[in-house]
A protein has these predicted regions:
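Active-site neighborhood of glycoside hydrolase catalytic domains
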Residues: 388, 405-493, 636
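Loop/turn elements at helix/coil->beta-strand transitions in domains of secreted/extracellular proteins
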Residues: 332, 362-369, 387-394, 427-433, ...
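Aromatic-lined substrate-binding rim segments of carbohydrate-active enzymes
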Residues: 368-412, 496-513
Length: 835
């Protein structure tokens, strides 16, 4: 490994500081105290200008004799950001120009015994963009919202140039592992695993390509067994059943050039992999060993797979063509969100950060995440976690909201990028879909600023996304469904936003400032983007502001709001629904309630129409810096109201209400593989939580069905509409209780009383239990903590009666701080209410 301590300098100048690799210019300078926190106040402006210079990373290392004697010595750079020249002992060994690729250089000729020096010079992307020479009639003028001109010319995460939720941090460096590989024997070049499903058996076909001399004297051994270990610890349910090992000589059963070899293993009584909520996430370990003629193991490659079928169903139906993930023959309703890079400084993206975010998704009952195309391809660890958690990955290729100049060099570069990443990820059980790009087909169809670009650039789009990229993906992975763009109806500019087929992005609520009720006018087959902004909590705002900055229209707050019209939109929707908050903290809190309400309104509607709509992925799950945004989890991992609400509206069973004239309809959505018997109670209550009317019913909702379970005429309450609220309570056969609350007027018109809430904390072994009581109706009650960060079992909940309510806090869910005991928790606890 060449990770560890390196020297950082401006190119050609004296040392600036030490930098830990994986690391970057920003992580090094900030860690050494050479710059302030790039995220604090308006430091983004200073940070951006640093990258008009070139930088170099250097270190020395010892090349041992046992390494030097090998025939091949390969320098492996898993992540170079981005325009890099690599020097060994003063001699140029190679260059890199794509942060999405792994770079491998044969450096044997440059090494000598003893101490060696490696130096990597990162060239300024600004200089590259300024010097770029377009072909005739192909200059690109389009710039994404919040971005920078020329960002699309470089294979670097687009959002590093800025987005409408992210800063222009740019950065450069060695953001993943760097190391030497030395060998003299043949090597495994590629392993591809495919499956053929049969009656109570699965044939696993392992195709292995081997390179090097004396290949014909080598053997391959493939062993498959249930995997009992996870990347997080022991996996339950696996009993380590091994299949028989398969051994053959390379070339015995293969093509004329004796490569690759295909080995087939049959697994009887297989344990299938299912998405979260549908069954177990059973996984199998496939171990491929390359042996010499004496049986000595030369190399071992291990991959983990799930036995399943997974594709997109596009059957024709009453409304057009469905768009639904189909797993093991079962069509599922996708529930999840869009995932962006976890940090602006990519070397700070750790397995722990990824695990926390994905666990938060699973806890909120997600079964799907979309890796958005304006960022980067996450590490193998990310997909291992998705495999274990049952999170289907909609995987965008890294092209988003842009116009590209498809030169020969660019085509070659992206083809290698795609081939490499598809081969790296194709075996994962969670991989559900390859998508060519984000919003680019729709942009050429509908965005005037893109349509005004050269017709030659439009032709480049067609060649790139209708031919070059699909060809590269299918050559490396013929098993996984490919989708040209998102949104799309199937490509070729065939009405890319058609609601009756393909996937849609819906932004009239928010960007179009239409009311939440507008969601009910649309019946998308699959809504892969829709969203609503909110501010982060006060604790997060305090991390990047001084006290004088804490006004949403201050220079600092607007710098941490990258959508120019967003603050006005938040206030517009607030004025439609709530009274103006009395202070800054309350404004942040109410903005989060608005966000959660908006997303709930859309998801509830589309779940009520399961079968016509088969998926909702809201925008967005996470942030890459502290900011006002569409995220449901902020940069520090703090759940906003939306994420707590998603845990309910994405539940395997979810209750919702909607008005149909004078009738309030109560629906129960059941996404589980079992029918659900229920008892339903509908209440009309006053502000003191007294029951004014009650209706009940019983019944059963079928497997993967959404159905109305009660209809109530509420026209008789018109004269009391400012003094009442409506509550639907569903009790399931297993004792689970689901609730939903609605009002007949916006909350701003309700005659809410100021609640008196008492809270007592009890310590119960590995958890604390908070016992709450309210003197009156208290909608969207929120619990916060001054020091520690915590994830509660429930939050932003409605207190609808005088009975005691209990909220659990598991001690393992206490982060970034400490809570010693019940008294300490009580002291740190703060309760926010709407009234």
């Amino acid at each position: 490994m060449l990770n560890g301590q390196w020297e950082l300098a401006e190119a050609g100048n004296d040392r600036l500081c030490e930098v830990q690799v994986p690391g970057s210019v920003l992580s090094g300078l900030y860690g050494a105290g050479k710059i302030e926190d790039p995220f604090y106040r308006t430091n983004e402006d200073v940070t951006r200008e640093l990258f008009r210079k070139d930088y170099e990373f250097s270190r020395t290392f010892v090349a041992a004799e046992d390494i030097l004697k090998e025939e091949k010595i390969i320098l492996v750079c898993e992540g170079l950001d981005t325009l890099a020249d690599i020097y060994i002992n003063g001699q140029k060994a190679g260059s890199a120009d794509n942060m999405h690729r792994i770079w491998k250089l044969d450096v044997k000729e440059f090494l000598h015994s003893g101490e060696n020096q490696i130096r990597i010079v990162f060239r300024s992307v600004f200089k590259y963009i300024e010097a770029y020479e377009y072909e005739d009639n192909k200059e690109i003028h389009y710039v994404p919202c919040g971005g920078m001109k020329g960002n699309q010319l470089i294979r670097k995460a687009h959002c590093m140039f800025g987005w409408d939720w992210g800063p222009q941090t740019i950065d450069a460096g060695i953001f993943r592992d760097i190391y030497l590989e030395a060998y003299s024997h043949p090597r495994i070049e590629d392993v591809k695993i495919t499956q053929v499903q049969g009656d109570n058996a699965v044939d696993v076909c392992t195709t292995v390509a081997v390179s090097g001399d004396a290949v014909d004297k080598c053997q391959l051994r493939v062993t498959i067994q249930e995997d009992a270990e996870s990347v997080c610890g022991h996996r339950t349910g696996a009993n380590d059943r091994k299949t028989e090992a398969h051994v053959c000589k390379v070339g015995e059963t293969v093509s004329a050039n004796n490569n690759p070899a295909v080995l087939t293993s049959s697994i009887h009584n297989p344990k299938l992999w299912w998405p979260n909520g549908y069954g177990d996430q059973s996984l199998y370990k496939v171990q491929v060993e390359l042996l010499d003629e004496d049986g000595t193991v030369l190399e071992t490659i291990t991959k983990r797979i799930g036995l399943r079928t997974l594709t997109i169903s596009q059957e024709k139906d009453l409304w057009g063509k469905e768009f639904a993930f189909c797993v093991n023959g079962v069509k599922i309703f996708a529930m999840g969100g869009n995932y962006i890079p976890e940090d602006c400084i990519y070397s700070r993206i750790t397995p722990e950060v990824q695990k926390y975010l994905l666990e938060s998704c699973k806890r909120a009952n997600f079964n799907c995440v979309r890796v958005w195309g304006g960022g980067y391809y996450p590490s193998d660890h990310f997909y291992d976690l998705c495999d274990e958690m049952g999170l289907i990955v909609w995987q965008d290729l890294m092209f988003a909201c842009n116009v590209y100049d498809l030169t020969e060099e660019f085509e070659e570069n992206i083809t290698k990028e795609i081939t490499e990443n598809v081969k790296r990820l194709r075996h994962h059980a969670s991989l559900g879909l390859w998508c060519g790009n984000n919003e680019m087909e729709s942009a050429w169809d509908h965005w005037p600023e893109v349509q005004s670009e050269s017709k030659y650039l439009r032709a480049d789009y067609i060649k790139m996304f209708e031919y070059v990229i699909p060809k590269a993906v299918r050559a490396a992975d013929s098993e996984t469904f490919f989708w040209q763009s998102s949104p799309s109806s199937g490509g070729c500019f065939d009405d890319s936003d058609d609601e009756n087929r393909g996937d849609c992005h819906y932004w009239d609520v928010w960007h179009g400032q239409k009311p939440f009720t507008d969601y009910q006018k649309h019946y998308f087959r699959f809504c892969s983007e829709f969203g609503f902004q909110s501010f982060p909590c006060l604790k997060t705002v305090e991390s990047f502001t001084e006290e004088k900055d804490r006004n949403i229209f201050s220079r600092v707050m607007e710098n941490h709001q990258k959508n120019p019209a967003a603050n006005g939109k938040i206030l517009y929707y607030l004025s439609e629904n709530f009274r103006y908050p009395e202070n800054f903290r309350k404004l942040l809190y109410v903005s989060q309630i608005l966000q959660g309400m908006a997303m709930k309104y859309g998801v509830d509607h589309w779940r009520r129409h399961r079968g016509r709509c088969m998926g909702t992925l809201y925008w967005q799950i996470n942030d890459n810096w502290p900011v006002a945004s569409w995220a449901s989890i902020d940069y520090f991992g703090r759940w906003k109201a939306l994420h707590y609400m998603a845990k309910k509206f994405y539940g395997p069973q979810a209750v919702s209400m909607c008005m149909d004239g004078d009738i309030m309809q109560v629906y129960l959505a059941n996404e589980s593989m079992d029918a659900q018997s229920y008892q339903v109670a509908f209440y009309v209550k006053n502000m003191e939580c007294e029951i004014l009317e009650k209706l009940t019913g019983t019944g059963t909702v079928g497997v993967q069905e959404s159905a109305p379970i009660l209809a109530v005429d509420v026209s008789g309450w018109e004269d009391k509409k400012y003094e009442i609220f409506l509550e639907a309570e569903v009790t399931l056969a297993d004792g689970g209780v689901l609730c939903d609350v609605e009002t007949l007027v916006p909350y701003k018109y309700l005659e809410l009383d100021k609640p008196e809430i008492t809270a007592e904390v009890e310590e119960q072994g590995d958890a604390f239990v908070i016992h709450l009581k309210s003197s009156c109706f208290s909608p969207f009650t929120a619990i916060g903590f001054t020091d520690a960060d915590v994830t509660l079992e429930d939050n932003f909940f409605h207190m609808t009666d005088g009975e005691e309510m209990c909220v659990r806090l598991d001690k393992k869910d206490i982060r970034n701080g400490e809570i010693m005991d019940a008294a300490d928790l009580t002291q740190q606890m703060e309760i926010l209410t709407l009234a």
